Amino acid sequence: MLSASTVNPSAPWQANLWLRYDRPGHRTRMVECLVQAPLKVQRSFYPDDTGQCQTMLLHTGGGMVGGDRLGYDIVLEAQSDVCFTSASAGKIYRSLGPWSEQTVNLEVRVGASVLWCPQETIIFDQARYQQNFCIKLQEQARFKGWEIVRLGRTARGEKFTQGHWRSSWEIWQGDKLIWGERQQLIGSEQLYESPNALAGFTCLGTYVDLSRSFDQDLVHQAQEIIHSQGRSPQFGLTLTATQGLIARYRGNSTQEVKDIFTQLSQVISP
């Protein structure tokens, strides 16, 4: 592992993490890793006998401030299987001007599989944050994962009434864009209270499963998972044009949405 960590401690972070995996036998392995502070990875581990490699992503700086630019460039060679998690919730601190930005580029080659399941991101009031995902899938490659955002430090009674959050997703199959989305929220009291925006809720989640084609039976299974928890109107399910599944959450509990998304990833996916 190489680490380039010579930085000015008073300057914004400009850091990248580059990883590559292959699968020469039963187990997926990390074969290349280049890191820059404050980004790190824990040693890979294998919690079961499937050969899936689990990698925990770390941010040792404690959070992002205005002007920080963090990038993840990850390649999975053919038949690799990797689950990415994070050690703790991400934190985006308030900024008087510059944006914080994080970009994730995933290249998933033939027959490889990715599960992307980090902890939530907490966006402080008055923060400015841009999150970008670009996922490129080759033939028979699979992706499932989520993004969970908490707006404001609600444990302190803070609301997201000032600030700006943007999220961009692009998922490609070869040279075809199979799913893309742009989200944007500009903090205000009106946004917080509007039934067409946050409706007083503080947590948003998006789950994307492009690991298989979903028929109505699988959609029904997904609905049963949601309804069995006693949650109803703040979840939504959508089939994409390529028969992938998108689930959405609007509520107040990061633990609730993580539990539901975890069940979806375990029960209805191969």
Swiss-Prot record:
Family annotation (InterPro entries): UreD (IPR002669)
One GO term describing the cellular component: cytoplasm
Compartmental location: Cytoplasm
Protein name (Swiss-Prot/TrEMBL): Urease accessory protein UreD
Pfam families in the cross-refs: UreD (PF01774)
Top-level taxon of the source organism: Bacteria
Major location category of this protein: cytoplasm
Keywords linked to the UniProt accession: Chaperone, Cytoplasm, Nickel insertion
Similarity-based family: Belongs to the UreD family.
Subunit and partners: UreD, UreF and UreG form a complex that acts as a GTP-hydrolysis-dependent molecular chaperone, activating the urease apoprotein by helping to assemble the nickel containing metallocenter of UreC. The UreE protein probably delivers the nickel.
Organism, scientific name: Synechocystis sp. (strain ATCC 27184 / PCC 6803 / Kazusa)
GO molecular function terms noted in the UniProt entry: nickel cation binding
Task performed by this protein: Required for maturation of urease via the functional incorporation of the urease nickel metallocenter.
